[in-house]
Regions:
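Hydrophobic structural segments
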Residues: 1-310
Length: 310
C-alpha cells in the first residue's frame, strides 16, 4: 500500500528548495529568495520559468500554481512603488491576487550542485568539471561539494568548434538570435569553460585556464573584442560562443523541478511541478545586414520565435 503524501506549505517548499540551492551561495549584490507569499499557504503546484514577466505570472495562475519559481529575481534592482501601472507591480498584483507566491533563485542556482552551469555542462557532455571561479562549499546529503560561478571541463573526445556549437544549439530552446561564434569553424576543442547568463565578468578567470572555448551569453562588443585580441597576441586563441541569456539558463529548470519534487517526497510531501512554455527571450526576429531588398536572405529569421519545450 502506497502512503499518501501530504500537501506542503509554502514554507516547506521554500525550505526544500533552499536545501538544494542555498541562499548563502548567492552573490552579495543578488536578491534571491522569497519575494511574495504566505508561509502557511498550501502548495499543490509549482511553475518554473527563467523570468518573472506579466505573461509568466498569468501563466502561473492559469496553470493553477501556488508558487512561481524564477531564475531571475523580479526585484533585483529594487522598487520603491509597485502599482499595477508598472511592470513589476503588474507581476506582483497578478500573482498575489491569484494566490501564487514568487521565489527567485539567481546566483545561488548558478553556483550550486546540479545548478544552472552544470545543466549547461550536461547539455554538451562535459566531464571532469570544476568551478571556474574560486570555489565555495555546499553540503548536500552529508557531503561537501566544491561549487562556484561558471564551470570548466573536458569533452570526452576532441571535436571542432562548429561541431560543439551545433551540439549546443541542438540542446538549447529556439531563439531569434541563435548562437554567435568567434573562432575558426575547424578549430579543435577539448577543454571548455562556460557560464550560463552574462559572463564577460569572468574573462580573466577563463584566461587563467587551459580552456579552448568559452560559452556564455550577453557578450558586448568591447569586452569580447579585447578578449579575442588578447587571445591572439598571447597565442591562446580561445574561441567564444555567445548564447541567448535566458536560453542558456533554461536547461536548469527541468532538473530543479525534478529534484525539488523528489526531495519533498522524501520529506513526506507531494507536489506537481510544471515548466513554463513561454519564450522569455526579448528578441522576436533578426534581419541580416549587408543584404539588399530582393536578395536571398536565407539566414534571416522573420517568424516570431516559437514557444519553448523544456
Amino acid at each position: 500500500m502506497t502512503e499518501e503524501l501530504a500537501t506542503p506549505t509554502l514554507a516547506d517548499v521554500v525550505d526544500a528548495f533552499h536545501t538544494l540551492f542555498p541562499p548563502q551561495l548567492a552573490a552579495g549584490w543578488d536578491a534571491s529568495g522569497l519575494v511574495a507569499g504566505r508561509a502557511a499557504a498550501p502548495v499543490h503546484t509549482v511553475l518554473f520559468t527563467v523570468d518573472a514577466l506579466a505573461a509568466t505570472a498569468e501563466e502561473a495562475i492559469a496553470e493553477g500554481a501556488q508558487l512561481l519559481i524564477t531564475h531571475h529575481p523580479l526585484l533585483l534592482r529594487g522598487a520603491q512603488f509597485i502599482p499595477d501601472s508598472t511592470y513589476k507591480g503588474e507581476v506582483l498584483h497578478t500573482l498575489i491576487e491569484g494566490g501564487c507566491g514568487l521565489l527567485g533563485a539567481h546566483t545561488n542556482a548558478d553556483a550550486a550542485v546540479e545548478g544552472v552551469n552544470e545543466a549547461l555542462c550536461d547539455a554538451i557532455g562535459l566531464i571532469d568539471r570544476e568551478p571556474l571561479t574560486e570555489a565555495q562549499t555546499q553540503v548536500l546529503d552529508g557531503q561537501e561539494h566544491a561549487v562556484g560561478t561558471g564551470r570548466i571541463g573536458t569533452l570526452p573526445e576532441e571535436i571542432t568548434l562548429k561541431e560543439l556549437a551545433e551540439r549546443l544549439a541542438a540542446a538549447l530552446p529556439p531563439t531569434a538570435g541563435g548562437l554567435r561564434i568567434a573562432g575558426r569553424a575547424d578549430q579543435p576543442i577539448r577543454r571548455v569553460a562556460l557560464c550560463g547568463g552574462a559572463g564577460d565578468s569572468l574573462f580573466d578567470a577563463v584566461r587563467a585556464t587551459d580552456a579552448q572555448v568559452y560559452i556564455t551569453a550577453d557578450l558586448r562588443h568591447h569586452p569580447a573584442s579585447e578578449f579575442r585580441e588578447t587571445a591572439r597576441v598571447t597565442g591562446s586563441n580561445i574561441a567564444l560562443i555567445d548564447c541567448s541569456h535566458p536560453a542558456s539558463e533554461s536547461l536548469w529548470l527541468r532538473s530543479a523541478a525534478d529534484r525539488l519534487r523528489k526531495l519533498l517526497a522524501e520529506r513526506g510531501y507531494g507536489i506537481e511541478t510544471k515548466l513554463s512554455a513561454l519564450n522569455t527571450d526579448p528578441w522576436d526576429f533578426t534581419v541580416p545586414t549587408g543584404v539588399q531588398p530582393g536578395q536571398d536572405a536565407h539566414s534571416a529569421s522573420t517568424a516570431a520565435a516559437p514557444a519553448w519545450e523544456l
